[in-house]
């Protein structure tokens, strides 16, 4: 069966609440460890997300946990809670040996929807690592997420377009080739975003 990413929040309803598990009284570090327990991961995630910036130190420390499920969960949390100090750590997590962690890291770097007023990272921080993974990461899921991040800069950086065109032409995965094609001239996302002003496209407010 192919691996399918399931957002943690999609699993919330069938599971116990944080109050039932006593997580309201649990310290941040213990909650981060619970991200590696399939029976408690969703409730721990919700409680850490509720604590927000107050839990950031423990979440960042969790990026170095030996359990890849903990590292993945921390990347997902930073999707919502990312700040200036966390961006470099997320870039480093894209090199994680577990592909699920790399996927979560690239999503956190590329997605504005979850971040409220947080500025997006600029090309100086993320474009070269994203291009490298798009070209050579062994996992197609990671390459697909890298394409999304590279695509954010397709209107502002020729390196992004060149990398996406190469991926669209040569990637061994049809899914990655298709996604890369969305972000090059003539592609659906590229042409739709071309109608927006530069400020509306906004990957260009660097942290």
Where are these regions (language model features)?
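Short, Lys/Arg-enriched segments at the junction into DNA-binding effector domains
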Residues: 136
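Terminal, low-structured helical/coil segments at or just beyond the last alpha-helical repeat
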Residues: 182, 186-207
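HEAT/HEAT-like alpha-solenoid repeats
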Residues: 87, 122-128, 160-165, 196-204
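Structural detector for internal amphipathic alpha-helices that build alpha-solenoid repeat scaffolds
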Residues: 2-23, 29-33, 38-53, 58-64, ...
